[in-house]
């Protein structure tokens, strides 16, 4: 089975995130995608909205998609979340006979060498890298450009930022075109104040 793992803060999840999931399912022949809202990120300050809110939003968006699972594996774990540790847990749960893929943005690929056990990660899974429209000039390490376990997709996903959505909600601006309508009211309620 081909399993893609899509971790992120999803603070909140938006149409751009959904387009990535749709693209991977439709074009990369995945059997399953596991969406993982991060608990305490290893590479950022912990200024995330409540974990249960982010998890609830993700679950609502994908509740009718049998190929998408929303997991609380990182939210439930104590301490900082590291992709390597999460992947090992998922391999234990689903079995090492499956083929695992990690979905990341090009900005994350640029910093991949700073990730915990990144070399082992590259042996355990393949990376599907999406390019941001505004990140065309990011320099990618030659080790990654020539690595068979890193798939860089030239297509561009929607250039939407969760920060932009949070700011619009605080300023009582319309977010209809940025988020799934199933969760619009929930996002407006939960993100109206910090």
Feature locations, PLM:
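Nucleotidyltransferase catalytic core that binds NTPs
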Residues: 1-194
